[in-house]
């Protein structure tokens, strides 16, 4: 059989560029606007963004929450100021409201100082700062910034708190101070020597330069009452932002579940997330707008405590037809418009919908990885084909499931021992089931997990691998089912998933 290189093969499919080599919104920001297809959550969320309402997006990993965030930020308007929070290491894993407000203050402080610092030394600023404003800025510089050195910090504080002429006179004096000290020292030494000689006294010891004139130091008022509630400081920071022209403030809170301290444990993530969402008075601050992006598994644990009816709450998920639309759009963009539907590149569209699409787990990221595997299987089987055959789809699915990096969605704990349980250990137990639904007893009978069975189930629930069914099992027992379609496929097709595959 004649073989061609991979580029020639994909061109034979009708593609001008390969569309399945990157899998996250961050990796293709420039292309994202053209490729973006609106999920059901888009319309209500974008309306909320334009009307400055708080938005809370939740969904499974890979569903495109970050891509939707980018679109919502653009919908906030050209004059809006957006600050993103993706690093939570500055606050404890059991944060208080004060910790969270402090995180918000620090984030806004960085945005505020970027606006202020270029004009701090100007004789005429485009805004007038009161004494209270200056003290607040000084407080933010001292307590809510981490990138400025101590010397630069003090320079910035002086720029804010002292008049330009006063700073110039002080720096001029301090510059000539060493010369003045030397001159004064020489005069005093000469006088001392003359007096000593005339009186027949021992000569005085001549030391180094003496500090006859002390340096003038511009004091900094750092006495802002730190006992005041961080909420008040946050409100004052928002007001100051507005005063200097930062009218539309948006805080985007994303990737809470990716904090390594939380070990990908949905219970820990939920405990960390809860104070962000509950009893949070700042959500009612008129001049500050929030957009949250949250993994659905921990969010469902927090949702009963969250007054969601007061805000825009949208689940990001994709129905099969929506996934096909986004696939079609991607193929069209990477074929210069020659491919307008997936059916043009597959041999059997019905098989694709029935067997391939469900494995995508209702999210674009998995679909791109699945398509990548299927196309490569077709290349390996017949690189001269201009369509993807059913055999390539079937073998591509199996390789996709076997070789999928489950740590992407269920990462190994940071401090885990080599022999500790992880997602592959749990899948190995589930692999022994005869059905994707099970009870504690049926899992124990199949996998021999013994007295640890219930602990395993709790752990699998915690990471989102399995879920509890609404209906009951035999004799009223609790019934569970496997959530991940890849693991479901493995159980139904007796396919072993191994860490070293």
Can you annotate each of these PLM segments?
Residues 1-98, 123, 499-501:
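Walker A/P-loop-proximal flanking segment of P-loop NTPase domains
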Residues 2-6, 358, 362-451:
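Winged-helix-like regulatory helical subdomains adjacent to P-loop NTPase cores
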Residues 60-246, 465-466, 475:
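P-loop NTPase nucleotide-binding core
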Residues 126-146, 331-388:
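Conserved AAA+ ATPase small/helical "lid" subdomain
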Residues 447-463, 468-469:
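Short amphipathic alpha-helical interaction segments
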Residues 470-478:
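Short, Lys/Arg-rich nucleic-acid/phosphate-binding segment
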């Amino acid at each position: 059989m004649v073989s061609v290189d991979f580029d020639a093969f994909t061109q034979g499919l009708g593609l001008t560029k390969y569309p399945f080599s990157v899998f996250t919104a961050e990796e293709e920001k420039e292309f994202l606007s053209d490729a973006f297809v609106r999920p059901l959550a888009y319309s209500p969320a974008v309306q909320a963004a334009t009307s400055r309402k708080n938005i809370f997006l939740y969904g499974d990993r890979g569903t495109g929450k970050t891509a939707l965030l980018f679109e919502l930020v653009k919908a906030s308007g050209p004059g809006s100021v957006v600050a993103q929070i993706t690093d939570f290491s500055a606050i404890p894993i059991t944060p208080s409201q004060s910790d969270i407000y402090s995180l918000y203050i620090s984030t806004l402080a960085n945005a505020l100082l970027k606006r202020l610092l270029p004009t701090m030394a100007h004789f005429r600023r485009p805004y007038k700062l009161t004494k209270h404003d200056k003290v607040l800025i000084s407080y933010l510089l001292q307590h809510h910034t981490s990138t400025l050195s101590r010397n630069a910090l003090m320079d910035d504080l002086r720029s804010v708190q002292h008049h330009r002429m006063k700073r110039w006179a002080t720096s001029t004096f301090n510059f000539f101070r060493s010369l003045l000290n030397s001159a004064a020292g020489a005069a005093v030494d000469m006088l001392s020597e003359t007096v000593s000689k005339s009186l027949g006294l021992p000569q005085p010891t001549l030391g180094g330069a003496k500090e006859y004139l002390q340096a003038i130091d511009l004091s900094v008022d750092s006495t802002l009452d730190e006992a005041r509630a961080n909420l008040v400081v946050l409100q004052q920071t928002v007001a100051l932002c507005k005063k200097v022209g930062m009218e539309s403030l948006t805080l985007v809170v994303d990737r809470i579940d990716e904090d390594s301290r939380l070990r990908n444990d949905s219970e820990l993530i939920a405990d960390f997330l809860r104070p962000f969402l509950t009893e949070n008075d700042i959500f009612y601050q008129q001049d500050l707008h929030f957009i949250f992006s949250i993994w659905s598994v921990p969010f469902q644990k927090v949702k009963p405590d969250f007054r969601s009816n007061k805000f825009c709450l949208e689940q990001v998920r994709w129905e099969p037809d929506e996934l096909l639309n986004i696939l079609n759009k991607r193929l069209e963009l990477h074929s210069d418009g020659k491919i307008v539907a997936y059916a043009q590149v597959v041999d059997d569209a019905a098989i694709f919908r029935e067997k391939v699409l469900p494995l995508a787990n209702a999210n674009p990221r998995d679909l791109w990885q699945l398509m990548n595997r299927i196309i490569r299987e077709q290349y390996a089987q017949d690189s001269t084909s201009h369509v993807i055959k059913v055999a390539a789809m079937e073998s591509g699915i199996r390789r996709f499931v076997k070789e999928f990096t489950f740590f992407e969605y269920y990462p190994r704990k940071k401090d885990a021992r080599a022999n500790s349980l992880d997602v592959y250990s749990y899948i190995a137990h589930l692999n022994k089931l005869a059905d994707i639904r099970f009870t504690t007893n049926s899992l124990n009978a199949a996998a021999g997990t013994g007295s640890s069975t219930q602990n395993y189930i709790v752990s699998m629930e915690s990471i989102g691998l399995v879920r509890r069914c609404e209906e009951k099992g035999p004799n009223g027992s609790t019934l569970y089912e496997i959530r991940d379609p890849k693991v479901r496929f493995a159980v139904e097709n007796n396919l072993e998933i191994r860490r070293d595959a």
